[in-house]
């Protein structure tokens, strides 16, 4: 003969199992969806890092090529001016612009205003520890 406490135990145990089964119908699919979203975050983070590094290297190569081309153009222009220096009249002096400027015209204290061989974007990338900028 079963005592009253055994009957209560069976009622509580069966109700616990029923509630656990119903909860698992919700929890297990939600855990699966959460796992899929977490995996997507990791995959997209990896792809983002790869595309950033590719774009950064493409930018640095293009920036270097552009600076090299502009430097060659500048050297060519200087060479052309030097070869024609004896034949051409002296250049006329250009009017100065500074007297026409206002009182705050010479205020320009931007950080990184020193001359550099890299562009402003490449200089900002030099500050990152995980990025290596090469010329």
From Swiss-Prot:
Q: Which stretches of sequence are listed as region Disordered?
A: 70-122
Single GO biological process annotation from the record = sporulation resulting in formation of a cellular spore
The annotated regions of Polar residues compositional bias extend over 70-87
Query: Topology: which residues are Cytoplasmic?
Result: 1, 46-135
Enumerate the transmembrane spans.
2-22, 25-45
Q: Keywords in UniProt for this one?
A: Membrane, Sporulation, Transmembrane, Transmembrane helix
> How is it placed in the membrane, per its record?
Multi-pass membrane protein
Domain of life, source organism: Eukaryota
Q: What is a single cellular component term in the Gene Ontology annotation?
A: membrane
**Location of this chain's protein in the cell:** Membrane
Pfam families membership: Osw5 (PF17062)
Q: Which InterPro entries match?
A: Osw5
What ranges are annotated Extracellular (topological domains)?
23-24
Q: Identify the main location.
A: membrane
Stated family:
Belongs to the OSW5 family.
According to its UniProt entry, the function of this protein is described as:
Involved in spore wall assembly.
What name appears for this protein in its UniProt entry? Outer spore wall protein 5
């Amino acid at each position: 003969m079963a005592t009253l406490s055994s009957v209560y135990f069976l009622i509580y145990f069966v109700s616990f199992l029923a509630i656990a089964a119903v909860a698992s119908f919700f929890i297990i699919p939600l855990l699966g969806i959460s796992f899929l979203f977490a995996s997507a975050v990791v995959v997209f983070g990896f792809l983002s890092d790869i595309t950033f590094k590719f774009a950064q290297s493409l930018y640095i190569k293009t920036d270097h090529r552009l600076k090299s081309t502009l430097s060659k153009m500048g050297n060519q222009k200087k060479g052309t001016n030097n070869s024609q220096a004896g034949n051409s009249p002296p250049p006329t002096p250009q009017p100065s612009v500074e007297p026409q400027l206002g009182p705050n015209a010479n205020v320009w204290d931007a950080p990184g205003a020193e001359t550099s061989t890299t562009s402003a974007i490449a200089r900002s990338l030099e500050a990152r520890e995980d990025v290596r900028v090469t010329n």
